Amino acid sequence: MTNYKRIGHIAIRAKDIDASIAFYRDLLGMEEAFRMYNEAGRLSTIYVCLAPGQFIEIFPDGLVERKIDTDTIGYSHLCIEVEDAAKTLETLRAGGLLVDRELQTGLSRCRMFWTHDPDGNRIEFMELTPESLQAQAIKRLEAL
């Protein structure tokens, strides 16, 4: 077994850092953890906290747009696990969240809905139901 603890952060480069912070901090409700500045005093990175010890690292000044869809090779999406997908959807939608795919039960029997950030990065919100394959795998792996 490895000594991995968790995914510490994901990193994205934003075209408009203010729009990204408004999305992740103000709309999704993540706490801004800290900002880093380079030697010239210019903003280089903003960290927002998703959950204890888990961050999204946002870099400003993205210049090159890329096609982001289900067929793109490489990074596909961020999945945020939530306690209650329906309640989360209702709360975020009331705050102005645009939903790409409505709440549904996936092949793995989890409940999920989808959105995207200001740069088009896909985000899945997922609730693990007791019968979901993920919840079953977690139980099995914790028993090892």
Feature locations, PLM:
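Conserved beta-strand in the GNAT
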Residues: E57-F59, E124
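Vicinal oxygen chelate
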Residues: M1-N3, R6-K15, T45-L50, R66-L144, ...
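Core segments of cupin and vicinal oxygen chelate
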Residues: T2, R13-F55
